[in-house]
């Protein structure tokens, strides 16, 4: 899908027969369209609430107010010290008090499959304001293109607005499915993923999950590359700057080694395997930071760097660590470095993950076709997400939505407001279908 008005224009895709769609769903779809301005106002309000790491309290309060205003119960799942001892919790573990995820369960009649809709409340820091044409927390709207600007507009305040709006429509239309529909509004997607982990550990599980994060209406993600963060330390040999040839400058040695490691790691892209061939470089090596220092007239004898890599299967965390360590040691030995490099494997690390089921993939495609999207490309991503926590519990999961947004993590992040009601209707169709099929009934019915 390209451009601004291609949701259904000229589409020859299969559109579901309205006669077999429950009248309540039709009314709900009409309500979604009729309240476009409400959804715009809601997203604008959410964008105007800064919610970076450890400062999410205000947006959590607002979500809880919205939920309780609908007569529902907001279950708070704390981000507390219990996470510190969890094997799959990532650092840093915050000590800031009263930080909570929000979970809302719409109970079904019974007998149907349950579904989680997961979105995240936290955002990336706003960055350098000088690089922007719109202030990061303004929620500025370009009326000509019906586009809203602001940090988190796509990632993931749009997902939050869609979940809250869908919740409101379901409640006010008195819709009830056979299975439970569970909304998870989580913290720390942008840094640790511990919010989704905490919700699942608290028992908020389901038969499938959709994470509203990172894609547009014609794209879904069913697997992720692995990631590995590490520190690299290198020691040199002391000497005065006036006779630097007698020493070994640790800063220079480390810079040269990092270039070698980057180039060696990137060469692995030449042998990448499908479906990762759709990316030019799923193997990525990024230097996040470097440090070296010395007195004025001396060479630095210690240097360190913080690095981050991504890697597709069949590589694993262990095989990537072995590759990097071998490359670093052989490079140092070949150049007669005074010391071998020291790798410190204490950073963020995730294995490649895939946990979608064919049933869930087909359901996403079917709901998209019903709404005029001829095809949804479902495939891998070189990024990472909270999918790994669902995979660990055997819960089928895809990332889908929240819609057409641009510049996440960059200046002038923005989102096309037409996709708020559009994606809301797709998730309504997905929910109606998934939650109305019994656990053991794997045959599909017509929506």
Describe these PLM feature segments.
Residues 49, 166-173, 260, 264, ...:
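Active-site catalytic microenvironments for nucleophilic, acid-base chemistry
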Residues 75, 115-117, 208-210, 288, ...:
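Hydrophobic/aromatic beta-strand patches that form the interior of the parallel beta-sheet core
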Residues 85-88, 95-102, 111-182:
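Active-site metal-coordination/substrate-binding segment of hydrolases
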Residues 118-120, 185-186, 210-213, 233-235, ...:
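Short beta-strand segments
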């Amino acid at each position: 899908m390209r451009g601004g008005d291609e949701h259904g224009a000229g589409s020859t895709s299969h559109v579901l027969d309205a006669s077999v769609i429950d009248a309540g769903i039709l009314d709900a779809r009409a309500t979604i369209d009729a309240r476009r301005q409400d959804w715009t106002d809601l997203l604008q309000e959410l964008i105007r609430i800064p919610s970076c790491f450890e400062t999410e309290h205000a947006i959590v309060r607002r979500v809880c107010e919205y939920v309780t205003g609908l007569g529902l119960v907001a279950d708070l799942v704390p981000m507390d010290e219990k996470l510190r001892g969890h094997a799959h919790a990532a650092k840093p573990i915050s000590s800031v008090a009263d930080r909570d995820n929000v979970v809302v369960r719409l109970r079904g009649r019974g007998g149907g499959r349950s579904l989680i809709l997961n979105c995240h409340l936290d955002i990336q820091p706003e960055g350098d304001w000088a690089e922007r044409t719109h202030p990061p927390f303004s929620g500025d709207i370009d009326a000509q293109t019906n586009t809203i600007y602001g940090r988190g507009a796509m990632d993931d305040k749009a997902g939050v607005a869609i979940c809250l709006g869908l919740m409101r429509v379901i409640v006010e239309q008195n819709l009830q499915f056979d299975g439970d529909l569970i909304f998870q509004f989580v913290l720390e997607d942008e840094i640790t993923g511990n919010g989704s982990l905490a919700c699942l550990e608290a028992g908020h599980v389901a038969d499938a999950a959709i994470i509203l994060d990172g894609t547009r209406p014609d794209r879904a993600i069913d697997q992720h590359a692995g990631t590995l963060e590490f520190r690299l330390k290198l020691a040199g040999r002391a000497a005065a700057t006036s006779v630097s040839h007698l020493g070994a400058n640790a800063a220079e040695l480390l810079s040269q080694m990092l270039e070698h490691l980057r180039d060696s790691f990137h060469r692995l892209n030449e042998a990448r395997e499908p479906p990762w061939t759709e990316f030019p470089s799923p193997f990525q090596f990024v230097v996040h930071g470097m440090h070296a220092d010395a007195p004025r007239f001396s060479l630095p004898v210690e240097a360190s760097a913080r690095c981050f890599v991504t890697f597709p299967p069949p590589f694993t965390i262990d095989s990537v660590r072995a590759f990097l360590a071998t490359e670093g040691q052989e490079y140092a030995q070949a150049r007669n470095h005074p010391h071998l490099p020291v790798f410190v494997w204490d950073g963020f690390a995730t294995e490649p993950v895939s946990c979608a089921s064919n049933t869930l993939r087909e359901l996403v495609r079917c709901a998209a076709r019903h709404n005029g999207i001829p095809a949804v490309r479902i495939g891998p991503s070189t990024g990472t997400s909270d999918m790994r926590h669902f995979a660990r519990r055997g819960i089928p999961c895809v990332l889908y939505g929240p819609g057409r947004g641009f510049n996440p993590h960059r200046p002038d992040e923005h989102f096309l407001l037409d996709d708020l009601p559009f994606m809301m209707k797709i998730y309504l169709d997905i929910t109606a279908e998934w939650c109305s099929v019994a656990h053991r009934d794997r045959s599909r019915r017509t929506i």
